[in-house]
Amino acid sequence: MLKKTLLSLAITASTAGLTACNISSIDNNDDVAKAPIQAGQPGQAPATVSPLFNPARGQLPLATDFLFGFPKAEDGKTPKYATDADGTLYHKGAYEINLLEERISLIQPGQEGYNPVLNALNEMDGVSINAELDIPLNGNIDIASVIPGKNIILLPLNYDDPLIDEDTKSGESPFKAEFTDYTVSVVQYATPPNEAEKFALRVNLTKPLASKTRYLVILANNGSDSIKSIDGKPMVMPVQYKSLAGDDTLLSSKLAPARKLVKNWTESAKGYLASKQQDPNGLVMAYTLTTGGGVEVLSTMAAPGNANSDLKQDPALRAVVAKAFADNPNDVAAAQQQAAGTLVGAPYNVPAGSVAAVIGLATSLETPGPRAISLPAAGVDLDSDGEIGLNIANFIPSYANTTFVNVLTGSIDLPYYIKAPQGAYTGENALTAPGYLCTPSSASDALCIAGKTSAGNTIVSQWEADDSLATDLQNPALTPPSANVTRLFPFAKKNGMRKAPVLVVKPAGTVPPGGYPVVIYQHGIFGDRTDSLGVAKQLADAGFVTVAIDLPLHGVMPTDVISGTTTPIFASLLGAKGTDISGFDAETQALYVSGETVAERHFGLTRDAVEFKPTAVSGTNPALNGSGSLFINLVHLQTARDNMRQAVMDLLNLNASLGSIDLDNDGNTDIDVTKVHFIGHSLGGIIGTTFVATNNLNGTTLNPNGNAALPLITESVFGMPGSAIPRLLEASASFGPSIKAPLTTSTENGGFGLLENSESYNQLFYVFQGALDSVDPASFAQAMNQIPGNLAKYMVIESIGDQVVPNSAPSPLAGTSPLAALLGTTQIDTGTSDFSSGKFFVRYKDADSSHGSLASPGKDLIEADAFTEIMTSTINLFSGGNPAVTGSTVAPIAAE
C-alpha cells in the first residue's frame, strides 16, 4: 500500500557519492546521519550566523548540483547506472538500496517506502526554474542587510547545455550577465515546540530562471555591505564548507568528490568577485545549481525539428528526418535524400543499410497533424429548423428563442501518451474487453480483476520515452537509458489512440465563402466541453464557429453534482431530445453512465468519495460524478504534469485538424484556418497559455524548423488563468484547503503528517513546481512575449478578488497578475486609446465579477454585465479590431 509518510528531503551525503561522514569530528566518522541535525537548541541563538552546509549531515540547500553527483564507473566519467544518463536528478531515499549501497530500483506507487516527492525529484531533469530558492541558515538575519547583486549573486554560467558539455564555451567568458529578477526574504519554518527554530534566506523569483542553465550562487560580505545577523554580526563561512574548500587532509577519501565540487565553486566565485572589484576573501559560500527544462519537451513534441542535434538517440534521429520533410514539403524524394545525407554522417553515423528504416520509422512519429473530426451526416441530428445538429436551447433553456445557433456533436481520435485503463483505447470496448468496468465473476476472474486494477493508470501513470526506433532497428545503442521523458529525451511513446468527443457550435445558415473563422474553447477544472455553450452562442451570433473538447479525465457526467438529477444535456449530447435517460433499457443506461457511448474522456471513472482512487461514475449518486476529480493529485506528481502535457498535445492536434471540419457535408472544409482564435477559462486558460505559446512558436510562421500543420492562433483570450501552479493552488481560497488537508493530516488518519510551512512542507511545493515546470505557463510566457503583437494578439482577464485562481500570492510568480506581467501585457480600461502592444490585461471589479464570469452566464444577474462586456471586447479582438472595453464592471487603471 502507499506509504504516505513524507521523508525528509535533506540531501544526504550519498547524493555526492559520499558516506555520511561528519567532517567536523574524527569520532564516529562512519556513522550515517539519517536526519538533519538541528542548528541549536530551542530558544538558543547561535554565536554567529552562517548558511547551513554539511553534506555529511544532509544540511544543504535543496537545489544544488550535489543532486547531479552520480556514482561513476571505473573510467571516472561514465555514470555507474545507465538511468543517470537521462539527465535526471538523484536522491537515494527514492530507491531500494541493497547492503552494498547499490541501487536496485526506484520505489513506485503502491510499494512500501514510496514517497511521491522523492519519486518526482528523481525524475526531474534539473532543479526548478520557477520555484523560490531557499538557503537554510543556522539563525535569523537582518534582511535589510541582504543586497542582491552585492552580497547575494545569481550568476548564469556560459554552457550550451551543462548536461551535454562538461566545460563552458571555449574562448568565451565563463560568466553571463547576472540574473537580477528576484527579491529576497527571510523564512522562519514552522517547527514543533521541542525543536530548534529554523530559518532560510529565500530567493523569490520575479521571472523564471533560464532552462538548462547552470547558475553559480554566491553569498559574500563586501565591507559594510555584509549580510548580518539580527544583532549586527557579519555572516561567516560554514566550518564544513571552509574545510572542503581548503587543503587540509580529508577525514575520509570518500569526501573527495565533494571537495572537488566545493573547490570549483569557490575558485569560480572568488574569480567573479575579483572581476567586480569586490574582496574575494569576503566569500561566505558558493554553490552551483543546474536548471531543468522548460519549453523543450512540448516544443520538440510539437515540431521534432526542434530536437537537440547534439544527441545521438531516438529523438535526434527523428528530428533529422522531420526537418528534412519540413524543408521539402512537396518533394518526398528530396526530403529522403536530405535526411539520408545527414544520418550517415557524424554525429549520427547510421549505417547506410539502416537509413531507409530510420526514415520510415521516424515519419511514423505521432507529431501533431491533421486528423479527421467526425460530425453528423446530412439528415441526421436535425433541429426543429431543419439544420444539422441540435438547437442550443436543448442545452441552455434560457436560449429557447434562439434560432441562429446550432450544436453538432462529433469526435476525434487523439494519440494518448498516458496509460489508459484496459479496454479504453479506440477499437476496444471497455464493457466487454472485459475492461476496467467489469464485475468479477469470482476471485479467480483474473482478466476482470486485472482490468479493474488498470483503472489506477488514471492516477499513477506518466509519459514514457519513445523507444520504438531502437526496438524496430534492433539497435540497443538507440535505446533511451530510462523511461523518463526529459529535455534530453523529449519524445513520449504513444500508448494508443483515444476517441475524444468534439462539440461544435455554429451559426445557422449557409457557410460563408472561404469558411467560418473558428474559436477553440478550453474549459476549466471540473468542467467539460459544454461549458463553452454560453460563450459559443455569443460567438455564433458574430459569425464564429466554436470547437471544444474536454481536458483529459474530464467529460460530461450523467448526474448533476448540484441538483442530484440526471444531467439534461447528457441525453442531448447523445442525440436524444429528452431530458432523462431513465426511459432507455438497462444496457443502454449502463453505456450512458460509463461514458462509452461517446467515449467520455473520464473513462467512466471519477474520484472515490472517501479516498483518492478511481471508481465508476454513478447514474444516481452525484457524489460520484466529479468531472476532472482525478486530474490533479499528490499521489504521483508526474501524473498531474502529464495530464497537462497531454492536454496541450490534444489542443495541438485539434488545431491541426480544424481544416477537416465539414459542417454541411458537401465534402469541403468549412473553416478558415487563417483565422483561428482561442479562449481558455481557469485551468483552460492556464493550459491554454502553454498551448498557444507552443503552437505559435513551433508553427512555420515563426520557426523554420516548425510544424507546417499548426495554424497560427491569431488572437487569444485567457480568462482567469495563473502561473506557478502549485503555489497558486496553495493560495487559492477555493482549492487551498483541499490541497493542504492531506498534507497536514496526521499519518494515523491517512495524511502525510507535515506541519504547514515546515521545511519539508516547503520542499514538497518546490518539487511539485519543478515537476510541473515543463508545462507551467510561467515557463512559456516570456518566449510567447517575444512574438510580435501584430502577429498574435492576446488578452488576459482577471476578476479582482478571485477566490479560485488568486490575483497574486506570496510566491511572486503565482497568480493571474504575475502571468499577465510575464506575458508583457498592458492593462487597459474604458479610457484606453493606445492598443499598439497587442497584449492586453483587463481587470474586472470585485463586486461585479467572479472567477466564473466568463463561463457561467446567466447564473448570477450581478455578473451578467461582466459577461456581456467580456464577450464584447473578445469579439472585437477576434474580428480584427481592438478589445475596446466599455461598461461599469471594468476596473480603472490604478494611479501610479
Identify the role of each PLM range:
Residues 677-689:
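Gly/Ala-rich beta-loop-alpha elbow adjacent to hydrolase catalytic centers
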Residues 385, 666-668, 802:
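Acidic carboxylate motifs that coordinate Ca2+ or other divalent cations, activating on Asp/Glu
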Residues 461-491, 511-652:
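Cap/lid segment of the alpha/beta-hydrolase catalytic domain
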Residues 34-43, 239-265, 562-586, 686, ...:
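A catalytic-pocket lid/entrance helix-loop region that shapes and gates access to the active site
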Residues 384-514, 644:
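N-terminal cap/lid segment of alpha/beta-hydrolase-fold proteins
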Residues 23-424:
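Acidic, low-complexity Ser/Thr/Gly/Pro-rich repeat segments typical of extracellular/periplasmic
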Residues 503-506, 517, 635, 646, ...:
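C-terminal subdomain of alpha/beta-hydrolase-fold enzymes, centered on the catalytic histidine
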